[in-house]
Regions:
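Chalcogenol-based redox active-site neighborhoods
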Residues: 1-153
């Protein structure tokens, strides 16, 4: 199980435009990686828009933000366009990253069990270690909560 202090697992995924993005691209920089279940769903829209609305504070402090789901590049393009998102979304269609970050598993809704992505966020420091893991997220204020925890707000 991933814990604070562990090295963040490497990843190599395409963003919404088909550009390869890797953990090593962010060496020397703080990074927020937030995993979410599905493009264009109510909670995911609120969370993404929270980061969108706070992205200038992140940029000002040289912090990158990545959203990750198992949706396709095309789905991400549509999501970004509709919500006017201003940070990359990674397409983990093969479920490599959701598995390496341990956010893929059995979920339950209305008594029905299914496999899906848990809403979870990782704060990665400049050396590539995990500074914090958010197991529970308040979608509407999550971006502000991260800034507060990194003492940036």
């Amino acid at each position: 199980m991933l814990s604070v202090g562990d090295n963040a697992p490497e990843f190599n995924l395409n963003d919404q435009d088909g550009k390869l993005v890797q953990l090593s691209d962010f060496k020397g920089k703080k990074l927020v990686i937030y995993f979410y279940p599905k493009d264009q769903t109510p909670g995911c829209i609120k969370e993404a828009c929270s980061f969108r609305d706070n992205i200038e504070s992140y940029k000002k402090h040289d912090i990158a933000v990545l959203g990750v789901s198992i949706d396709s590049e095309k789905s991400h393009q549509n999501f970004m366009s509709k919500q006017e998102l201003n940070f990359p979304l990674l397409a983990d269609v093969e479920k490599e990253m959701v598995n390496s970050y341990e956010v893929w598993g059995e979920k339950s809704m209305y008594g029905r069990k299914y496999m899906g992505t848990f809403r979870k966020t990782f704060l990665i420091n400049e050396t590539g270690s995990i500074d914090k893991i958010y197991e529970k997220v308040k979608v509407a204020t999550h971006a502000e909560d991260v800034l507060t925890d990194w003492e940036i707000s």
